[in-house]
Amino acid sequence: MPVYSIAESLIAWLGDSGHAAYHIAPPAEDAPTEFVTVERTGGYVADKVDHPSVAIQCWAATDTDAERLAITIRNLVELGARPEGVGHMAINSGPYAFYDEETRMPRYQLYVDIACQLTD
């Protein structure tokens, strides 16, 4: 039985929505002007349903653009069609500024609570 990856599903879903999305931020020289990273940060399983908590980080050249991208992603989560295998998505917190000291690139983050299948 194949394992369902919420991170892979969200990355594909965001890509299909026109947003460059990755597990890990690409090197600065290879990165698009705006992109999104997706990371499962926790969660639990109950009654054969996976309930992952996911951090979505929105990166851009300026703080304003990073915030706008985060708001766009927030609206997609709340108002858009769900990725295949996902029954529920809701913003837990964010978007909020989450500046990256290492790359010095503006970044906003939001946390999403999800209910999804355990397997494909």
Cite the ranges covered by each PLM segment.
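Small/polar-rich, solvent-exposed N-terminal microdomains that initiate assembly or binding
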Residues: M1-A46, T64, R68, N75, ...
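Short, charged interaction patches at domain edges and termini
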Residues: M1-A12, E29-D30, T41-V49, M89-D120
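Charge-rich, low-complexity amphipathic helices
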Residues: V36, A60, P95-Y99
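Short amphipathic alpha-helical segments
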Residues: P52-A55
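Short hydrophobic/aromatic beta-strand micro-patches
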Residues: Q57-W59, A115
